[in-house]
Amino acid sequence: FRLSNLAAEKIVDDIESIFENKKNFFEQDHSKATYANKINKEEGRIDWNDKAENIIGKINGLYPVPGAWFYFDGARYKILKASVSKNSATPGKVINDNIEVSCGTNSIKILEIQREGKKIQNIKDFILGTKIKKGVNLINA
């Protein structure tokens, strides 16, 4: 709520500055402009060999669509929230009962997840009904 108030104040200040000719505008240098391709769903696939920090970046950067995801037992799972942990094991291995997954460097603690066709769940609720357990490896699962 505070951020929206600050943004509203800033917009009013900027509009006033424009009308008072206090803003300097510069045309973009088109020779330095770059093009970003459309993000496709496949870019959201998680590579467990990557660093945990990079995977968290993918989760945050691709949220909510297309999302960061992995396959397990024929179903696609989208991770919506996660955090970095310092534990490690073989990349892709679930290393504890809270579904913490080891990555190339460190691990991620999954906090919120969604199985395809199902509702979003916090990890505590998800654990109660999943086959993803400690010791399972999510690479090629």
Sequence positions of predicted segments:
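An anion-binding loop in the catalytic cleft
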Residues: 49-141
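Active-site-proximal loop/hinge segments within enzyme catalytic domains
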Residues: 1-85
